Amino acid sequence: MKTEKPKKLIRWCILGAVGCGFMAVGDWLLGCIPLRETDTGLFNRAYYLSGSYGLWKPVLTVGLGAVGGFLYYFVVKALNADIDTKYRKTKIIQYLCGIFTVAVALTIHTWVATMAWFTTYLGPRIGEEAAIAAVTAYQDGMLLAIAPMYVPMILAFGIHFVMLLAGKTRYSRWMLAFHPVTWNLLLAAVPDIAQAMQMPVATWMSVMSQSSTNSAIMVWCIAAAVYERSHTQ
């Protein structure tokens, strides 16, 4: 089942990988900091609270996210084109969820970046406890709107995963090894496993966990582009 020209799909995958790269770099800017055993969550981190973190980094993260979010559209097009045209309703649902995911990705990216900015700015000025209380209130307030946004994102990638598993896409089932769902679970789980094994807290844990989703999608885009190229020669 091949409904799209391979060259077009390769182009979409490459543009999507670049977009994920921009988003992942933003994640790395937020997560690449010295960690302490007492650090928890996305913003309760000693390095932020001390004011040592550069305030320009969250700003750059949002800028990179805007470019990455735009290029995410090509990820959506590529994923949707993979699904067999016989499943028209499934393709429509997956596509609409994918389009919404583009907006969700930038929204969440900005939300996390602003928490880092507020924590860094407020920590040295009003004290660590007051800063944590203020940013926690901001996080909890925004979470009411943010949490439901994960549903279409999960559906966009979950539907594609199920269709690939069922053999209803243009790819062989072994491509599940490179699927965003597979790699997202892997990248998110490794730091937790390392901590369960009582390994010292390290920067790589934060970076891997924080960038897991964007890195996972980038892995898929690269793998899909390579697959298409190898099957058109």
Give, region by region, the residue ranges found by the protein language model:
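Hydrophobic, aromatic-enriched alpha-helical segments typical of multi-pass transmembrane helices
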Residues: K2-Q233
